[in-house]
Curated annotation (Swiss-Prot):
Keywords: Antibiotic, Antimicrobial, Disulfide bond, Fungicide, Secreted. This is Dolabellanin-B2. One of its GO terms (cellular component) is extracellular region. It comes from the Eukaryota. GO terms for biological process: defense response to bacterium; defense response to fungus; killing of cells of another organism. The keyword Disulfide bond applies. The keyword Disulfide bond applies. Contains two disulfide bonds.
């Protein structure tokens, strides 16, 4: 679900210093729905 993508995005942002890579993964996640 999209909610899973949002949760994964927040976890990524919290644990990584590369927001760009997090948002790329987020958009790929949304496209897979």
């Amino acid at each position: 679900s999209h909610q899973d993508c949002y949760e994964a995005l927040h976890k990524c942002m919290a644990s990584h210093s590369k927001p760009f890579s997090c948002s790329m993964k987020f958009h790929m996640c949304l496209q897979q729905q």
